[in-house]
């Protein structure tokens, strides 16, 4: 079984982001980076699939030279190969442009039975790239996967989280899965694999190499961010003390003042 996992490098979520109002970008200079956590669930799921069914796991990302550290982390967890899609044309790509580029890269790398992504990246929470890859490749998809139930030569059955509860879905291979945190607990890299990952050669691909049209990505993407801003701070709550009747009277009065009722 050939498995590919898409990894995204994101700013450290323990740091409050600063925004550049002129560019609508998050200021990343001097900010530590990390792998989007749901993507590590995807790597773990891929490793378990090949441990149970044979094959190998490859990891792929789109970004600059610095994103190789995230690919090396995937290798240190147990992936066999890593690929970097790197081209300045992809800068400022929206979810469609990112999905398009990754799908082109996947086609150029080879055939895969299962393609795994995190359910969403924690920097934008869009959750669109995994489904977009499936659409671009014209293959099955199961989103918000909480458990991989079974795999046959032709199908994969998984449980997925939905607003109505939990669903069990069977899809034909090849299939794209987007992974929930509850799917598994990502393993820690071993020292041996970390050393091997640090020495590994990571092939780079650009638009020309994967057959992607630069006119469709980056600033030419179908959508663009109009405004990026931090939410207004919430007011702290007010604690009302007294007997129940008095509390109810004060609470109603305040709700009327706020025009809530």
Say what each PLM segment does.
Residues 1-261:
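N-terminal glycine-rich FAD/FM-binding segment characteristic of electron-transfer flavoproteins
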């Amino acid at each position: 079984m050939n498995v590919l996992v898409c990894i995204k490098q994101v700013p450290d979520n323990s740091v409050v982001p600063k925004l550049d109002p002129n560019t609508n970008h998050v200021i990343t200079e001097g900010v530590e980076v990390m792998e989007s956590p749901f993507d590590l669930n995807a790597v773990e799921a891929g490793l378990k699939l090949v441990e149970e069914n044979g094959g190998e796991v490859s990891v792929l990302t789109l970004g600059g030279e610095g994103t190789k550290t995230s690919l090396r982390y995937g290798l240190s967890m147990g992936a066999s190969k890593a690929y970097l899609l790197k081209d300045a044309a992809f800068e400022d790509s929206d979810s469609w442009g990112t999905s398009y580029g990754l799908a082109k890269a996947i086609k150029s790398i080879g055939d895969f039975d299962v393609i795994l992504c995190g359910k969403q990246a924690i920097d934008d929470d869009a959750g669109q790239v995994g489904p977009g890859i499936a659409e671009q490749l014209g293959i099955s998809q199961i989103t918000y996967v909480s458990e991989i139930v079974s795999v046959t030569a032709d199908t994969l059955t998984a449980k997925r989280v939905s607003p109505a509860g939990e669903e069990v879905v069977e899809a034909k291979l090849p299939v794209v899965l987007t992974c929930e945190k509850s799917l598994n607990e990502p393993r820690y890299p071993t020292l041996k694999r970390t050393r091997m990952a640090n020495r590994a050669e990571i092939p780079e691909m650009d638009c020309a190499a994967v057959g992607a049209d630069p006119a469709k990505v980056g600033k030419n993407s179908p959508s663009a961010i109009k405004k990026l801003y931090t939410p207004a701070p919430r007011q702290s709550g007010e604690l009302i003390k007294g007997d129940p009747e008095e509390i109810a009277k004060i609470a109603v009065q305040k709700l009327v003042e706020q025009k809530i009722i």
